[in-house]
Amino acid sequence: MDETIATGLRLPSGLVALQDGRFALVEMDTSRRCLKLFDTSGAHQEICRIGGSPTGIAIDGDGCFWVADGPENSLVRLSPQGRVLQVIEGSADGPFLHPNALAFGPDGLLYMTDSGIRLDDLLEGGRIHPDFFKAAYNGCVYQIDPADGRVIRVLAAGLLFASGIAFDANGLLYYSETLTGKVHRQIIGGRQELFVQSMTSPAINMLRGPSGLAFDRSGVLYCAMYGLGEISLVDTEGRMAGHIRTNGTRPGSIAFTIDGKHLLVSEQENGVVEKITAPRPGLPLHMPTIS
């Protein structure tokens, strides 16, 4: 069953389930740029106005929020009350361009995708530039020490709009490359490999492709297909195993509820969060204690 549990949102993006059953979500639109908490009834509370173009979110074991693409394209750590605790602006190689999605690993470190292009270079008059595919992307995947607030290393570079990121039950890292339709898999510190090609052709004329990622407990990967109006299911061998249609065409981020029974989807065409009954229970996220 698919139901809408939050409406009136403006470019809803990253979302994450909390231990008490609520979920947190960020809105990218310039009129919002905020972090909100939602309960199961859809009632919400705005925690803070972050600034920037908040895109991704993760929560640690201290209950603090990590938000990708805060002011000046930064990664920001916020207290449960929304107070800024830490700001990370880049690596030794230079500043971040457009931080996108976040996931804590089994090692307690934080992993982040950077789309590889500044939003100002991607947009024209508030809309996607018609020549977006020809832009000079350098999408990256970063390994970050959250305690020290520094980038440890770059795990991947040169990606065409790096987007979603997730770990499977075996600790392997997965991340999506939206414009090519690829989802990559990687042992931390090892070589990148193609896990699945989710589209038959690259996104040349319309921004579309794999975005947010999440795993269920059986190892199936759930991949939000932005611009295509569906969640693709991929089995452990990298084969397409099914599709779940969304009500809108632009699903971006996905997350399982804390009990694992439902999938939450932020959908930008209608400005909503959709709640979908999960075929199988979701895999719990890593939430390490930092302080």
Language-model segment annotations:
Residues 181-182, 197-236:
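Loop/turn-rich, solvent-exposed surfaces of beta-rich toroidal or solenoidal domains
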Residues 8-22, 50-69, 92-110, 135-140, ...:
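Beta-rich, blade/repeat-based domains predominating
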Residues 33-36, 74-76, 139-142, 182-184, ...:
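A short loop-to-beta-strand structural motif that recurs across blades of beta-propeller domains
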Residues 1-6, 42-49, 83-92, 150-156, ...:
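A short beta-strand motif characteristic of beta-propeller blades
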Residues 28-30, 70, 115-117, 178-179, ...:
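Short loop/turn segments immediately following the C-termini of beta-strands
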Residues 112-136:
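Short, conserved, GDST-rich strand-edge loop motifs in beta-rich repeat architectures
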Residues 38-43, 79-83, 145-149, 187-191, ...:
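Short loop/turn segments that connect beta-strands within beta-propeller blades
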Residues 25-44:
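Beta-propeller domains
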